[in-house]
């Protein structure tokens, strides 16, 4: 049974106590839109992981502070393929596709867009500048199922406490690397103690 708007109406009075709200498209869209609106009205940052990918209204996009997508979701949202067949040959890896895809999404009203690039790292396109952070190298891939969730959890935790975007992205990448080196989905999510 899916959550309904009626079940989250209490948030209108509570949301100002939050540092950040994380949404994803597995939640019914009308619930996401209402929570995002509450957060926006109370100046609470909203992180959206728009998977599974659905059409997002312009109004909803303007409530989002950080939109985090992987290469496939970026392509679904923009039509721009971010090539990932370089196999550690950095001379063949070009950030332009990720930069353009993130700019297209920013043009729809989201101020900050992150595109996770798997073993290549992550880009972050903000109103001020473009960031790129390489992934942690030489990690044995055991199970990648929770890598995105690990990255998003670490990003959200650290963006509320650290001023340095570089440090936030490094910690999020490291957390995702710990996750892919461990079997299971929930079991692979590291604790904050393991990340330190």
Q: What would you call each of these model-derived segments?
A:
Residues 55, 80-196:
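Conserved phosphate-binding/catalytic region of the ribokinase-like
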Residues 7-13:
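Short internal alpha-helix immediately C-terminal to a glycine-rich phosphate-binding loop
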Residues 4-7, 20-95, 120-122:
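Conserved beta-alpha-beta core of the PfkB/ribokinase-like small-molecule kinase fold
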Residues 19-20, 112:
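Structural motif
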Residues 13-14, 60:
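Structural alpha-helical scaffold elements that stabilize or flank donor/cofactor-binding regions
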